[in-house]
Amino acid sequence: MKKNLTFFMVIALLFTITPNVYAMHIAEGFLPPMWSGVYFVISAPFIIIGLKQIRERAKDNKDIKMLLGLVAAYAFILSAMKIPSVTGSCSHPTGTGLSAIIFGPFISAIVGLIVLIFQAILLAHGGITTLGANTLSMGIMGPIVSYLIYRGFKNKNQKVAVFLAATLGDLFTYFITSVQLALAFPAQQGGIAASFAKFFSIFSITQIPLAIMEGILTVIIFEFVMKYASKEIEVLGGVRK
């Protein structure tokens, strides 16, 4: 299992070497300080619970950390593929649907946070001041939707459940990002509602096809994980065929 996951992660790192330097989600300094602080506070409890869950589950099987690294690498790859969209932001897959399906929403918050920190520091995508806002949308709210959808549909058709979870979780991430931007920058005419409609409609043009592609790719990667990390999946107890 370790050899297979190590190979996958090496390939993943090769794909992350990219000349593109677009802002990831909401760019550094783009949000007013008050809103940046609010999103840090909201995200904090999820991060704390996620850290506790990782420690507890790693006691049963140390290879779970390797699996966690795999899903983090997957999220890093997808979220590095960017298409410029709204001023101060961009569209891209999120990749956190896979971690939500395998680990649940709280550990996915850690995955999202790690990916966002590395991209902010190494690739100048996103930023530190907007880390709370971006973690809330990509690492928390999107994965919550992915997790709930997967749990609701997995007993009917697992592949369909994975596809819907990844696709709709991606779209909900941008729904939340649009809300965040609308709250920070309400339109002079129409206020928050008009601002949200503008942001989300522009996001949707590029995000809907990206979300569908992410859903398809997540099904493929999920099958790979189920094949080569079945023991770790059993320890987690969240994924059942």
Swiss-Prot record:
One GO cellular component this record assigns the protein to is: ATP-binding cassette (ABC) transporter complex
Subcellular localization: Cell membrane
> What's the short name of a Pfam family annotated to this entry?
CbiM
- Gene Ontology molecular functions: cobalt ion transmembrane transporter activity
Q: Give the signal peptide as a residue range, or say none if absent.
A: 1-23
Q: Which family does the similarity line name?
A: Belongs to the CbiM family.
Q: Which HAMAP family match?
A: CbiM
* Record protein name field: Cobalt transport protein CbiM
* Record organism: Clostridium tetani (strain Massachusetts / E88)
- Higher taxonomy: Bacteria, Bacillati, Bacillota, Clostridia, Eubacteriales
Q: Which gene encodes it?
A: cbiM
